[in-house]
Protein backbone atom coordinates (compact mmCIF):
# COMPACT_ATOMS: atom_id res chain seq x y z
CA UNK A 1 0.00 0.00 0.00
CA UNK A 2 1.37 3.43 -0.99
CA UNK A 3 2.50 5.84 1.72
CA UNK A 4 3.48 9.49 2.02
CA UNK A 5 6.70 10.35 3.85
CA UNK A 6 7.09 13.91 5.12
CA UNK A 7 10.01 15.56 6.87
CA UNK A 8 8.36 18.56 8.42
CA UNK A 9 9.41 21.93 9.73
CA UNK A 10 9.81 23.73 6.40
CA UNK A 11 7.98 26.98 5.69
CA UNK A 12 5.89 26.57 2.55
CA UNK A 13 6.31 29.42 0.08
CA UNK A 14 5.41 29.90 -3.56
CA UNK A 15 2.60 29.86 -6.09
CA UNK A 16 0.22 27.11 -7.19
CA UNK A 17 -2.73 26.87 -9.55
CA UNK A 18 -5.88 25.53 -7.92
CA UNK A 19 -7.37 22.52 -9.71
CA UNK A 20 -10.95 22.17 -10.88
CA UNK A 21 -13.55 21.21 -8.30
CA UNK A 22 -14.19 17.50 -7.92
CA UNK A 23 -17.53 18.21 -6.27
CA UNK A 24 -18.54 20.24 -9.30
CA UNK A 25 -17.08 17.98 -11.98
CA UNK A 26 -18.86 14.83 -10.77
CA UNK A 27 -22.49 16.03 -11.15
CA UNK A 28 -21.57 17.71 -14.44
CA UNK A 29 -20.22 14.39 -15.72
CA UNK A 30 -23.51 12.71 -14.83
CA UNK A 31 -25.39 15.54 -16.58
CA UNK A 32 -23.95 14.25 -19.87
CA UNK A 33 -26.47 11.39 -19.60
CA UNK A 34 -29.25 13.91 -20.27
CA UNK A 35 -28.22 14.45 -23.91
CA UNK A 36 -27.07 12.41 -26.89
CA UNK A 37 -25.10 15.36 -28.28
CA UNK A 38 -21.32 15.69 -27.88
CA UNK A 39 -20.08 17.57 -24.81
CA UNK A 40 -16.71 18.90 -23.66
CA UNK A 41 -15.79 19.66 -20.04
CA UNK A 42 -12.49 21.39 -19.21
CA UNK A 43 -10.55 21.98 -15.97
CA UNK A 44 -11.46 18.49 -14.76
CA UNK A 45 -9.07 17.33 -12.00
CA UNK A 46 -7.12 14.07 -12.23
CA UNK A 47 -8.54 12.06 -9.34
CA UNK A 48 -9.63 8.49 -8.71
CA UNK A 49 -13.23 9.64 -8.15
CA UNK A 50 -13.22 11.22 -11.61
CA UNK A 51 -11.79 8.02 -13.11
CA UNK A 52 -14.51 6.04 -11.35
CA UNK A 53 -17.23 8.32 -12.71
CA UNK A 54 -15.89 8.03 -16.26
CA UNK A 55 -15.72 4.23 -15.96
CA UNK A 56 -19.27 4.34 -14.63
CA UNK A 57 -20.51 6.38 -17.60
CA UNK A 58 -18.84 4.05 -20.09
CA UNK A 59 -20.36 1.04 -18.34
CA UNK A 60 -23.82 2.62 -18.47
CA UNK A 61 -23.41 3.26 -22.20
CA UNK A 62 -22.08 6.82 -22.50
CA UNK A 63 -18.83 6.92 -24.47
CA UNK A 64 -16.61 9.14 -22.32
CA UNK A 65 -12.86 9.83 -22.55
CA UNK A 66 -10.47 12.03 -20.55
CA UNK A 67 -7.40 13.61 -22.11
CA UNK A 68 -5.41 15.70 -19.65
CA UNK A 69 -7.90 17.93 -17.87
CA UNK A 70 -10.52 17.70 -20.63
CA UNK A 71 -13.38 15.21 -20.75
CA UNK A 72 -15.36 14.53 -23.92
CA UNK A 73 -18.58 12.53 -24.04
CA UNK A 74 -20.17 11.38 -27.26
CA UNK A 75 -23.44 9.95 -28.56
CA UNK A 76 -24.81 7.23 -26.35
CA UNK A 77 -25.26 3.55 -26.83
CA UNK A 78 -28.34 1.99 -25.33
CA UNK A 79 -28.15 2.83 -21.63
CA UNK A 80 -28.08 0.08 -19.04
CA UNK A 81 -30.62 0.52 -16.25
CA UNK A 82 -28.60 -1.26 -13.53
CA UNK A 83 -25.71 0.35 -11.64
CA UNK A 84 -23.89 -2.53 -9.88
CA UNK A 85 -22.32 -2.61 -6.43
CA UNK A 86 -18.76 -3.00 -7.75
CA UNK A 87 -18.93 0.48 -9.30
CA UNK A 88 -21.23 2.27 -6.87
CA UNK A 89 -19.33 1.18 -3.74
CA UNK A 90 -16.27 3.16 -4.80
CA UNK A 91 -17.88 6.59 -4.77
CA UNK A 92 -20.80 8.13 -2.94
CA UNK A 93 -21.56 10.57 -5.77
CA UNK A 94 -22.65 7.60 -7.90
CA UNK A 95 -26.12 8.10 -6.40
CA UNK A 96 -26.38 10.99 -8.91
CA UNK A 97 -26.82 8.42 -11.67
CA UNK A 98 -30.39 7.90 -10.47
CA UNK A 99 -31.91 11.16 -11.65
CA UNK A 100 -30.68 11.25 -15.27
CA UNK A 101 -31.38 7.55 -15.91
CA UNK A 102 -34.78 7.61 -14.21
CA UNK A 103 -35.98 10.54 -16.29
CA UNK A 104 -34.63 9.02 -19.53
CA UNK A 105 -35.22 5.28 -19.05
CA UNK A 106 -38.17 5.50 -16.64
CA UNK A 107 -36.50 2.85 -14.46
CA UNK A 108 -33.18 2.39 -12.66
CA UNK A 109 -31.63 -0.02 -10.17
CA UNK A 110 -28.75 1.42 -8.14
CA UNK A 111 -26.74 -0.26 -5.42
CA UNK A 112 -26.56 1.76 -2.21
CA UNK A 113 -23.46 3.99 -2.50
CA UNK A 114 -20.05 3.97 -0.82
CA UNK A 115 -17.52 6.77 -0.22
CA UNK A 116 -15.88 8.13 2.91
CA UNK A 117 -16.70 6.51 6.24
CA UNK A 118 -17.78 9.70 8.01
CA UNK A 119 -21.12 8.83 9.52
CA UNK A 120 -24.68 8.89 8.29
CA UNK A 121 -25.07 10.39 4.84
CA UNK A 122 -28.59 9.12 4.15
CA UNK A 123 -30.06 8.70 0.67
CA UNK A 124 -33.62 8.89 2.01
CA UNK A 125 -33.77 12.60 1.11
CA UNK A 126 -33.13 11.67 -2.54
CA UNK A 127 -35.73 8.91 -2.51
CA UNK A 128 -38.44 11.01 -0.87
CA UNK A 129 -37.90 13.69 -3.53
CA UNK A 130 -38.16 11.15 -6.36
CA UNK A 131 -41.46 9.96 -4.89
CA UNK A 132 -42.72 13.55 -4.97
CA UNK A 133 -42.00 13.58 -8.71
CA UNK A 134 -44.08 10.43 -9.17
CA UNK A 135 -41.52 7.62 -8.93
CA UNK A 136 -42.18 4.28 -7.29
CA UNK A 137 -39.34 3.05 -5.09
CA UNK A 138 -38.38 -0.16 -3.35
CA UNK A 139 -35.18 -1.17 -1.55
CA UNK A 140 -34.22 -4.83 -1.70
CA UNK A 141 -30.96 -6.74 -1.50
CA UNK A 142 -28.87 -3.58 -1.20
CA UNK A 143 -30.37 -2.09 -4.37
CA UNK A 144 -32.74 0.85 -4.79
CA UNK A 145 -35.25 0.06 -7.54
CA UNK A 146 -36.95 3.15 -8.94
CA UNK A 147 -39.51 3.37 -11.74
CA UNK A 148 -41.75 5.96 -13.39
CA UNK A 149 -43.65 4.19 -16.17
CA UNK A 150 -45.78 7.23 -16.92
CA UNK A 151 -42.92 9.68 -16.66
CA UNK A 152 -42.12 12.23 -13.96
CA UNK A 153 -44.11 15.34 -13.15
CA UNK A 154 -42.94 18.52 -11.48
CA UNK A 155 -43.71 19.05 -7.82
CA UNK A 156 -42.81 21.19 -4.83
CA UNK A 157 -40.08 19.49 -2.80
CA UNK A 158 -39.02 20.70 0.64
CA UNK A 159 -35.76 19.29 2.01
CA UNK A 160 -35.52 18.89 5.80
CA UNK A 161 -31.84 19.82 5.47
CA UNK A 162 -30.12 21.54 2.51
CA UNK A 163 -28.59 18.39 1.00
CA UNK A 164 -26.08 19.05 -1.77
CA UNK A 165 -26.45 15.62 -3.36
CA UNK A 166 -30.25 15.65 -3.24
CA UNK A 167 -30.39 19.16 -4.70
CA UNK A 168 -28.14 18.02 -7.55
CA UNK A 169 -30.11 14.84 -8.14
CA UNK A 170 -33.43 16.66 -8.39
CA UNK A 171 -31.91 19.30 -10.67
CA UNK A 172 -30.68 16.50 -12.94
CA UNK A 173 -34.16 14.97 -12.93
CA UNK A 174 -36.56 17.91 -13.00
CA UNK A 175 -35.03 19.50 -16.12
CA UNK A 176 -36.68 16.76 -18.24
CA UNK A 177 -39.78 16.18 -16.08
CA UNK A 178 -43.16 17.60 -17.12
CA UNK A 179 -44.10 20.93 -15.61
CA UNK A 180 -42.56 23.02 -12.86
CA UNK A 181 -40.51 21.75 -9.93
CA UNK A 182 -39.73 23.93 -6.92
CA UNK A 183 -36.96 22.91 -4.52
CA UNK A 184 -37.30 24.54 -1.10
CA UNK A 185 -34.41 24.64 1.39
CA UNK A 186 -32.07 23.80 -1.48
CA UNK A 187 -28.31 23.62 -1.00
CA UNK A 188 -26.60 26.89 -1.96
CA UNK A 189 -23.05 25.68 -2.64
CA UNK A 190 -21.11 27.10 -5.62
CA UNK A 191 -21.09 23.60 -7.09
CA UNK A 192 -24.90 23.77 -7.33
CA UNK A 193 -24.63 27.00 -9.31
CA UNK A 194 -22.01 25.45 -11.58
CA UNK A 195 -24.29 22.49 -12.34
CA UNK A 196 -27.22 24.85 -12.97
CA UNK A 197 -25.07 26.85 -15.40
CA UNK A 198 -24.31 23.65 -17.32
CA UNK A 199 -27.97 22.64 -17.44
CA UNK A 200 -28.88 26.12 -18.69
CA UNK A 201 -26.28 25.79 -21.46
CA UNK A 202 -28.00 22.51 -22.38
CA UNK A 203 -31.33 24.30 -22.78
CA UNK A 204 -32.82 23.74 -19.33
CA UNK A 205 -34.87 26.38 -17.53
CA UNK A 206 -33.41 26.77 -14.04
CA UNK A 207 -33.91 29.81 -11.83
CA UNK A 208 -32.63 30.57 -8.34
CA UNK A 209 -29.62 28.25 -8.14
CA UNK A 210 -27.42 29.48 -5.30
CA UNK A 211 -30.46 30.49 -3.22
CA UNK A 212 -32.70 28.53 -0.87
CA UNK A 213 -35.42 28.14 -3.50
CA UNK A 214 -34.81 26.79 -6.99
CA UNK A 215 -37.41 26.64 -9.77
CA UNK A 216 -37.08 24.29 -12.73
CA UNK A 217 -39.41 24.27 -15.72
CA UNK A 218 -39.12 20.94 -17.53
CA UNK A 219 -38.24 20.85 -21.23
CA UNK A 220 -38.58 18.11 -23.84
CA UNK A 221 -34.93 17.79 -24.86
CA UNK A 222 -31.45 18.95 -23.88
CA UNK A 223 -28.44 19.48 -26.15
CA UNK A 224 -24.65 19.38 -25.87
CA UNK A 225 -22.42 21.90 -24.12
CA UNK A 226 -18.90 23.15 -23.44
CA UNK A 227 -18.01 24.13 -19.90
CA UNK A 228 -15.04 24.90 -17.64
CA UNK A 229 -15.36 23.50 -14.12
CA UNK A 230 -15.03 26.03 -11.28
CA UNK A 231 -11.91 25.95 -9.04
CA UNK A 232 -11.87 23.64 -6.01
CA UNK A 233 -12.55 25.82 -2.96
CA UNK A 234 -11.71 22.99 -0.53
CA UNK A 235 -8.32 22.39 -2.13
CA UNK A 236 -7.71 26.14 -1.99
CA UNK A 237 -8.64 26.28 1.70
CA UNK A 238 -6.28 23.39 2.43
CA UNK A 239 -3.31 25.24 0.90
CA UNK A 240 -4.19 28.45 2.74
CA UNK A 241 -4.10 26.50 5.99
CA UNK A 242 -0.81 24.93 4.87
CA UNK A 243 0.68 28.43 4.70
CA UNK A 244 -0.63 29.22 8.17
CA UNK A 245 0.46 25.99 9.86
CA UNK A 246 4.01 26.14 8.43
CA UNK A 247 4.39 29.90 9.05
CA UNK A 248 4.94 30.46 5.34
CA UNK A 249 3.20 32.19 2.46
CA UNK A 250 1.38 31.02 -0.65
CA UNK A 251 -0.27 32.59 -3.66
CA UNK A 252 -3.20 30.68 -5.11
CA UNK A 253 -4.02 31.30 -8.76
CA UNK A 254 -7.21 30.49 -10.64
CA UNK A 255 -9.42 30.66 -7.56
CA UNK A 256 -12.72 32.40 -6.75
CA UNK A 257 -12.20 34.28 -3.45
CA UNK A 258 -15.91 34.73 -2.69
CA UNK A 259 -16.27 30.93 -2.51
CA UNK A 260 -13.81 30.94 0.42
CA UNK A 261 -15.21 33.87 2.39
CA UNK A 262 -16.08 31.89 5.54
CA UNK A 263 -12.62 30.31 5.69
CA UNK A 264 -10.74 33.50 4.83
CA UNK A 265 -12.68 35.49 7.42
CA UNK A 266 -11.59 33.03 10.12
CA UNK A 267 -7.98 32.99 8.93
CA UNK A 268 -7.92 36.80 9.03
CA UNK A 269 -9.24 36.73 12.60
CA UNK A 270 -6.42 34.33 13.46
CA UNK A 271 -3.99 36.95 12.19
CA UNK A 272 -3.00 35.50 8.81
CA UNK A 273 -2.38 38.21 6.20
CA UNK A 274 -4.73 37.52 3.29
CA UNK A 275 -5.03 39.57 0.11
CA UNK A 276 -7.47 38.91 -2.72
CA UNK A 277 -7.85 39.87 -6.36
CA UNK A 278 -10.48 38.73 -8.84
CA UNK A 279 -8.94 35.26 -9.23
CA UNK A 280 -6.03 35.03 -6.77
CA UNK A 281 -5.58 34.76 -3.02
CA UNK A 282 -2.30 35.33 -1.20
CA UNK A 283 -1.79 34.22 2.40
CA UNK A 284 1.26 35.08 4.50
CA UNK A 285 2.19 34.37 8.10
CA UNK A 286 3.46 37.63 9.63
CA UNK A 287 2.87 37.10 13.36
CA UNK A 288 1.84 34.45 15.86
CA UNK A 289 -1.71 33.37 15.12
CA UNK A 290 -4.56 33.28 17.60
CA UNK A 291 -7.01 30.34 17.80
CA UNK A 292 -10.58 30.81 16.58
CA UNK A 293 -13.69 28.73 17.25
CA UNK A 294 -15.67 27.42 14.28
CA UNK A 295 -19.04 25.79 13.71
CA UNK A 296 -19.49 23.87 10.48
CA UNK A 297 -22.59 24.78 8.52
CA UNK A 298 -24.06 24.48 5.05
CA UNK A 299 -22.73 27.04 2.56
CA UNK A 300 -22.13 29.95 2.96
CA UNK A 301 -21.12 28.85 6.47
CA UNK A 302 -17.80 27.28 7.43
CA UNK A 303 -17.46 24.07 5.35
CA UNK A 304 -17.42 20.67 7.01
CA UNK A 305 -14.82 19.66 4.41
CA UNK A 306 -12.33 22.07 6.02
CA UNK A 307 -13.05 21.08 9.63
CA UNK A 308 -10.25 18.50 9.89
CA UNK A 309 -7.63 20.80 8.36
CA UNK A 310 -8.71 23.61 10.67
CA UNK A 311 -8.29 21.30 13.64
CA UNK A 312 -4.66 20.62 12.71
CA UNK A 313 -3.96 24.36 12.68
CA UNK A 314 -5.75 25.05 15.97
CA UNK A 315 -3.71 22.33 17.70
CA UNK A 316 -0.54 24.39 17.17
CA UNK A 317 -1.82 27.83 18.21
CA UNK A 318 -1.29 29.16 21.72
CA UNK A 319 -4.60 29.06 23.58
CA UNK A 320 -7.85 27.12 23.53
CA UNK A 321 -10.40 26.67 20.77
CA UNK A 322 -13.56 24.74 20.00
CA UNK A 323 -14.87 23.11 16.83
CA UNK A 324 -18.53 22.15 16.49
CA UNK A 325 -19.46 19.73 13.68
CA UNK A 326 -23.05 20.36 12.61
CA UNK A 327 -23.17 18.72 9.17
CA UNK A 328 -22.02 15.09 9.57
CA UNK A 329 -21.85 12.78 12.53
CA UNK A 330 -18.75 10.72 13.29
CA UNK A 331 -16.44 13.18 11.53
CA UNK A 332 -13.75 13.26 14.20
CA UNK A 333 -11.92 10.09 13.16
CA UNK A 334 -8.75 12.14 12.66
CA UNK A 335 -8.60 13.16 16.34
CA UNK A 336 -6.85 10.00 17.52
CA UNK A 337 -4.30 10.34 14.72
CA UNK A 338 -3.59 14.00 15.51
CA UNK A 339 -3.02 12.95 19.11
CA UNK A 340 -0.18 10.77 17.86
CA UNK A 341 1.60 14.01 16.88
CA UNK A 342 1.08 15.34 20.41
CA UNK A 343 -2.23 17.20 19.98
CA UNK A 344 -4.29 17.96 23.11
CA UNK A 345 -7.87 17.33 21.96
CA UNK A 346 -10.99 16.30 23.87
CA UNK A 347 -14.12 15.08 22.07
CA UNK A 348 -17.53 15.77 23.57
CA UNK A 349 -20.31 14.65 21.24
CA UNK A 350 -20.33 16.87 18.16
CA UNK A 351 -17.78 19.23 19.71
CA UNK A 352 -14.01 19.08 20.18
CA UNK A 353 -12.05 21.23 22.62
CA UNK A 354 -8.46 21.95 21.72
CA UNK A 355 -5.57 23.20 23.83
CA UNK A 356 -2.72 24.40 21.67
CA UNK A 357 0.67 22.73 22.03
CA UNK A 358 4.08 24.21 21.26
CA UNK A 359 4.98 21.72 18.54
CA UNK A 360 4.14 18.44 16.86
CA UNK A 361 6.51 15.48 16.63
CA UNK A 362 6.45 13.40 13.46
CA UNK A 363 4.60 10.10 13.74
CA UNK A 364 3.22 7.17 11.73
CA UNK A 365 -0.47 7.88 11.07
CA UNK A 366 -3.35 6.34 9.13
CA UNK A 367 -5.94 8.10 6.96
CA UNK A 368 -9.63 7.38 7.66
CA UNK A 369 -11.20 9.63 5.00
CA UNK A 370 -10.31 12.26 2.43
CA UNK A 371 -10.29 15.43 4.53
CA UNK A 372 -8.84 13.65 7.56
CA UNK A 373 -5.97 12.70 5.27
CA UNK A 374 -5.42 16.35 4.38
CA UNK A 375 -5.35 17.21 8.09
CA UNK A 376 -2.67 14.60 8.76
CA UNK A 377 -0.53 15.82 5.86
CA UNK A 378 -0.78 19.38 7.21
CA UNK A 379 0.22 18.15 10.67
CA UNK A 380 3.17 16.31 9.17
CA UNK A 381 4.31 19.41 7.30
CA UNK A 382 4.39 21.36 10.57
CA UNK A 383 5.83 18.58 12.74
CA UNK A 384 9.47 18.11 13.69
CA UNK A 385 10.94 14.96 12.25
CA UNK A 386 9.54 12.24 10.02
CA UNK A 387 5.86 11.50 9.44
CA UNK A 388 4.59 8.48 7.51
CA UNK A 389 1.01 8.66 6.27
CA UNK A 390 -0.61 5.38 5.20
CA UNK A 391 -3.87 4.59 3.38
CA UNK A 392 -3.29 7.58 1.10
CA UNK A 393 -5.72 6.26 -1.52
CA UNK A 394 -8.28 8.44 0.26
CA UNK A 395 -6.23 11.52 -0.66
CA UNK A 396 -6.10 10.44 -4.30
CA UNK A 397 -9.89 10.78 -4.37
CA UNK A 398 -9.84 14.53 -3.80
CA UNK A 399 -6.41 16.21 -4.14
CA UNK A 400 -5.01 16.63 -7.65
CA UNK A 401 -1.19 16.43 -7.78
CA UNK A 402 -0.87 16.86 -4.00
CA UNK A 403 2.78 15.75 -3.80
CA UNK A 404 3.82 17.86 -6.82
CA UNK A 405 2.12 21.01 -5.54
CA UNK A 406 3.52 20.69 -2.03
CA UNK A 407 7.02 20.08 -3.41
CA UNK A 408 6.66 23.24 -5.49
CA UNK A 409 5.97 25.11 -2.25
CA UNK A 410 9.14 23.67 -0.71
CA UNK A 411 7.82 20.70 1.25
CA UNK A 412 10.02 17.65 1.85
CA UNK A 413 7.43 15.09 0.79
CA UNK A 414 7.49 11.93 -1.29
CA UNK A 415 5.24 9.02 -2.10
CA UNK A 416 6.55 5.51 -1.52
CA UNK A 417 4.92 3.04 -3.91
CA UNK A 418 4.53 -0.48 -2.59
UniProtKB/Swiss-Prot annotation:
Q: What Enzyme Commission number(s) appear in the record?
A: 2.5.1.7
Biological processes per GO annotation: cell division; cell wall organization; peptidoglycan biosynthetic process; regulation of cell shape; UDP-N-acetylgalactosamine biosynthetic process
Q: What is its main location?
A: cytoplasm
Reaction catalysis annotation: phosphoenolpyruvate + UDP-N-acetyl-alpha-D-glucosamine = UDP-N-acetyl-3-O-(1-carboxyvinyl)-alpha-D-glucosamine + phosphate
Q: What class of enzyme is it?
A: transferase
User: GO molecular function of the protein, one example?
Assistant: UDP-N-acetylglucosamine 1-carboxyvinyltransferase activity
- Tell me which UniProt keywords the record has, alphabetically: Cell cycle, Cell division, Cell shape, Cell wall biogenesis/degradation, Cytoplasm, Peptidoglycan synthesis, Pyruvate, Transferase
Q: Which Pfam families match?
A: EPSP_synthase
Binding of phosphoenolpyruvate: at which residues? 22-23
Where does the record place the catalytic residues?
116 (proton donor)
Using the record's annotations, give every residue carrying the modification 2-(S-cysteinyl)pyruvic acid O-phosphothioketal: 116
Binding-site list for UDP-N-acetyl-alpha-D-glucosamine: 92, 305, 327
Pathway annotation from the record: Cell wall biogenesis; peptidoglycan biosynthesis
Disulphide connectivity of cysteines: none
Localization: Cytoplasm
Q: What does this protein do?
A: Cell wall formation. Adds enolpyruvyl to UDP-N-acetylglucosamine.
Family per UniProt?
Belongs to the EPSP synthase family. MurA subfamily.
User: Which HAMAP family does the UniProt entry name for this protein?
Assistant: MurA (MF_00111)
Protein name, entry field: UDP-N-acetylglucosamine 1-carboxyvinyltransferase
Amino acid sequence: MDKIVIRGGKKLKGEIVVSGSKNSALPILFATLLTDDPVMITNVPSLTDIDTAIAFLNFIGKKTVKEGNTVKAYSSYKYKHIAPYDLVRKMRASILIMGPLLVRLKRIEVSLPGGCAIGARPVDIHLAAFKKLGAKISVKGGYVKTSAKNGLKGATISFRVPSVGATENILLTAVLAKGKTIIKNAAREPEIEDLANVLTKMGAKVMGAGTKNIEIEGVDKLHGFMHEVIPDRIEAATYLIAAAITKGGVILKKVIPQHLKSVNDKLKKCGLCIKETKNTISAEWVKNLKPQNVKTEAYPGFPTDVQAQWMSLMCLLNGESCIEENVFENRFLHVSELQRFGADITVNGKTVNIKGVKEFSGAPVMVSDLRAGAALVLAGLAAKGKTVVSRIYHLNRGYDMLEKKLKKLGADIRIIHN
